[in-house]
Amino acid sequence: LAAFVGAVEGPVSALYAFGVLIPLAFVALLPAAAASGVPLPASVVAGVYLVALPTALVAAGAWLLAKRPVAFPPPQIGADHPAVPDRRPHAIVVGVLTAVGAGIVTAVGVARWAAPVGAAGVGIGAALLVAVRPRRVVLASVNETESGLPDAMTIVGGAVAEGVAVERAIASAGDRLTGATGDLFARAGRRSDTLRVDVREAFVGEGGPARTVPSPRVHGAVALLAIAAREGRPAGDVVLELADQLERLRELERDARRQLATVTGTLSNTAAVFAPLVGGATVALATGIDAAGVDGLHSLSAGGSGAAPSSGSGLGGFTSDAAASGGDRARPLPVPVLGQIVGTYTLILAVILTSLSTGLEQGFDATLVVYRIGIALPTATVTYLVAFVAAGLLW
């Protein structure tokens, strides 16, 4: 994992440059190209920003994630989990209502063309948060349980090595530990004592506290404890060895996340803040360049030939006399269309970069990925719109 941390920085920097900085900077050149008589049709710009670039980013991200070493797969929290109710109807209602509200506010406060961007980003983000919240709660409980597992196994292993029965050692661990792990072992100890069942049944039997915990680490520890209950005192050293391995793994993961913090932090900040900020400001700059460039060309045309400027020019047109004469070859790209394309691209970046950042840091945990995307989308949307308005006031 340490080698992966060093190897990933270069590819992530390249992805950052060619997937974010250069494409967003190129947006400002589009009105200049149109004013110079070389307009790019909307279909070409949309194809590049909404198909080609996202496809390349997804491929690069998948390549990076495939190289990440994984000691344990992340928890898989399915819809059949008893603590995960079906929130899809609630998510749809909340998503639609927030999308409508965000669209109206955006149309009134920013621009009519920005309403679809505002509605999509805020609405989808809100729907994802509502839909994934129960799974996020379960995931937090699983993570807390796993974090205390090395301590619990150390207590049990030490007691078993001294000749204490596994069942009593489990109950003792439950009494000495706090939090989710202590509760898990305490409940298993009570079940074993009350129902007179074996260790495996106490943990993962019908109604067992670990039965619905979707953690390979927890279930692996339970399997070892069940073997220790059969083998007796000699198995204590094996349990202690597992506890040491879990502790080393926890330290390794903590250290790797700390080393990856710069890379993953940059990706997360770019997804939610930097890319939308640059995108909104660049679209505002493109608007100003469009107005200044087209008016300048028309003035030169009028001064040189005595002809009046074409009535087809305007702030949202990206038009020029040369473009008009070549209108049959390529329709110029209006600012509203450009703003929608760039806005959609920033939302796509929010999804892709947030997924990549989370995958590099935690492994591709679907619950955590969806949860963070649900936060990143509204944040990116608001940042994009505010940047457009603020930059427009400056320019």
Kindly give the residue locations of the regions a language model identified:
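Short, charged cytosolic
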Residues: 1, 232-247
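Glycine- and small-hydrophobic-enriched helix-loop-helix hairpins
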Residues: 1, 149-234, 388-395
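Hydrophobic alpha-helical signal-anchor/transmembrane segments
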Residues: 2-162, 177-182, 210-212, 244-395
